[in-house]
């Protein structure tokens, strides 16, 4: 089944190598399907997701919040989450 929408988000890892701190950013995706939302570490049935919200930060970043049956999952994103939220709410 093809995803309705895929929202990229930033995963940040900090490492210390040879007495130097390095920050490594990788891109992950939150995939929205008709019946579920998939993240790299979880799969949520649409009925287990109560809401999806966001909050803008400085420097063009934004927090995307998945309010789920097991708690709130937070993702840092660089692009607008408006289309992801719109598609999610159209399923509810």
Residue locations for each model-derived region?
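N-terminal first-folded block
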Residues: 3, 8-34
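Phosphoinositide-binding peripheral membrane targeting modules
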Residues: 22-59
